[in-house]
């Protein structure tokens, strides 16, 4: 009987730990309206081509959230801490102001980690990112820009 009680207590403790982790993750998510009300900044962690306006997939979202910055996770390996701090200063991000990231989970996690390491304290995810096509913005004349993958394929001698 004592063993059953111990197992029950362990199961409850694990359940509470999972629930608190889930609650913490939920608390770290903001929707676009909440971010705007808090005067926060959205950051797109996807490759720049998608931020510029190229769709991620056939009939997929095209562009970026209004006033979003682009900090592609692909840049992180090439950015020193000093360069990232300069980027943060250039964009006037404050350590105590909310920042909401969007992109795929691994890109968001990579950027979140580096921004927190750089001292930003309120790093969340943007829960409704790329869900309202009418809200998305594109760089002017983005379609005249050469898509990076096309250029890479051309340089590799592949058919383009």
Predicted segment positions?
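Glycine/proline-rich, flexible active-site/cofactor-binding loop segments
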Residues: 3, 19-20
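Bacterial N-terminal signal peptides that target proteins for export
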Residues: 1-9
């Amino acid at each position: 009987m004592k063993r059953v009680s111990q197992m029950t207590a362990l199961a409850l403790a694990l359940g509470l730990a999972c629930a608190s982790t889930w609650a913490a993750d939920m608390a770290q998510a903001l929707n676009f309206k909440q971010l705007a009300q808090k005067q926060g900044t959205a950051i797109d962690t996807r490759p720049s081509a998608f931020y510029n306006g190229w769709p991620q997939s056939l009939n997929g979202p095209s562009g970026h959230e209004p006033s979003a910055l682009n900090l592609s996770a692909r840049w992180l390996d090439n950015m020193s801490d000093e360069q990232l701090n300069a980027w943060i200063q250039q964009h006037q991000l404050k350590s105590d102001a909310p920042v909401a990231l969007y992109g795929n989970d691994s890109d968001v996690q990579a950027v979140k980690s580096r921004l927190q390491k750089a001292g930003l304290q309120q790093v969340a995810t943007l829960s409704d990112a790329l869900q309202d096509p009418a809200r998305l913005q594109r760089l002017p004349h983005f379609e005249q820009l050469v898509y990076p993958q096309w250029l890479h394929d051309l340089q590799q001698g592949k058919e383009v």
